[in-house]
Amino acid sequence: MLEQMGIAAKQASYKLAQLSSREKNRVLEKIADELEAQSESILNANAQDVADARANGLSEAMLDRLALTPARLKDIADDVRQVCNLADPVGQVIDGGVLDSGLRLERRRVPLGVIGVIYEARPNVTVDVASLCLKTGNAVILRGGKETCRTNAATVAVIQDALKSCGLPAGAVQAIDNPDRALVSEMLRMDKYIDMLIPRGGAGLHKLCREQSTIPVITGGIGVCHIYVDESAEIAEALKVIVNAKTQRPSTCNTVETLLVNKNIADSFLPALSKQMAESGVTLHADAAALAQLQAGPAKVVAVKAEEYDDEFLSLDLNVKIVSDLDDAIAHIREHGTQHSDAILTRDMRNAQRFVNEVDSSAVYVNASTRFTDGGQFGLGAEVAVSTQKLHARGPMGLEALTTYKWIGIGDYTIRA
């Protein structure tokens, strides 16, 4: 089965690579329209997936990721339309010039070819990834989690209808709908057909892909994100940022998981934090230095376990640790961070600059929420993933991350001397 999918995707990629920006946008507009026109079939499929997942004991955080509503589906369709409005990087001349030999040389952006994406209970990923791949002239093979099998099948059927109505092969966007985990291992060895693999899921999935894949892998998306509250931070303003970073949508990878508090501001900051977190329904996991003071406040507090500093809670839970200074905060982030998103709240711009220079994450913020690490917020449109590695792509992966380049030499029967 996967062999045939690979062949179909590779053939489709050749046709997609030749499309003009106008032709690609016409396909995306059709997909957005069909997602809305056929929303009932997608929502019905999703309702069945959610019911099964709840019966199987899936966590509330994962159920939130899995669930679609009419409003969420409309947002997904609107995101596709936003991709239409983005500049098409394919064909862009990155640099070039005329050599001494007279050869005119260009470095030009081109599609990667076929993208493979493995993800878990995130039905929006199906459309986000498909739209970005189509915009950049790439075919895509999708493998969603078993929890989303009905939703993904219904969504891909709608996308393929739109493709065919525009005269393009259905092989441009395909989904592996068999939940057999053995197919993941088989997919990881499809380097004959797939040019780049992107896993979106937990640490176990990323480890599996790194160890078994014969395809280049872009990993990331695991977000043990930190906010450091410097001694000069404005408490009321800092709390607004922390509430946003923790509670806006706790099941996302750019949500803050650990709060590092400078010891010199702790006495005034912790009571205010407890009050705010109680109002927000957040459970605090406090270290020994913060525990007694936080227990005196209204928020729910437990003693932090050492391993929780490495946890991506994806829930209304927040570690709180007292640190001696900026050096201590940076050391903690280096030990426990996942190079996703980290922030400093401060009025001291020298400390801010040190934090930016010394914290080696894909996104680093000064006096801003970690929740900004998102393709849409960065002006990239829907993102295919957030990469926390350094090669090929880093941070939210928009259109350019789905391209490579080729060198083009144009001469007049020019020969090398």
UniProtKB/Swiss-Prot annotation:
**What's in the keyword line of the UniProt record?**
Amino-acid biosynthesis, Cytoplasm, NADP, Oxidoreductase, Proline biosynthesis
Q: Which GO terms describe its cellular component?
A: cytoplasm
> Which chemical reaction does it catalyze?
L-glutamate 5-semialdehyde + phosphate + NADP(+) = L-glutamyl 5-phosphate + NADPH + H(+)
- MF-aspect GO terms: glutamate-5-semialdehyde dehydrogenase activity; NADP binding
Q: What is its EC number?
A: 1.2.1.41
Where does this protein reside within or beyond the cell? Cytoplasm
InterPro entries named in the record = Ald_DH/histidinol_DH, Ald_DH_C, Ald_DH_N, Aldehyde_DH_dom, G-glutamylP_reductase_CS, Glu-5-SA_DH, GPR_dom
- One record GO biological process: L-proline biosynthetic process
One Pfam family name from the record?
Aldedh
Q: Which Gene3D superfamilies match?
A: Aldehyde Dehydrogenase, Chain A, domain 1, Aldehyde Dehydrogenase, Chain A, domain 2
Q: In which pathway does it act?
A: Amino-acid biosynthesis; L-proline biosynthesis; L-glutamate 5-semialdehyde from L-glutamate: step 2/2
| Superkingdom in the source lineage | Bacteria
Nucleotide-binding listed as a keyword: no
Looking up SUPFAM superfamilies in the UniProt record yields: ALDH-like
Biological role: Catalyzes the NADPH-dependent reduction of L-glutamate 5-phosphate into L-glutamate 5-semialdehyde and phosphate. The product spontaneously undergoes cyclization to form 1-pyrroline-5-carboxylate.
UniProt family annotation: Belongs to the gamma-glutamyl phosphate reductase family.
PANTHER family in the cross-refs: DELTA-1-PYRROLINE-5-CARBOXYLATE SYNTHASE, GLUTAMATE SEMIALDEHYDE DEHYDROGENASE
NCBIfam families, from UniProt?
Answer: PRK00197.1, proA
Protein name as catalogued: Gamma-glutamyl phosphate reductase
Read off the lineage from the record: Bacteria, Pseudomonadati, Pseudomonadota, Gammaproteobacteria, Enterobacterales
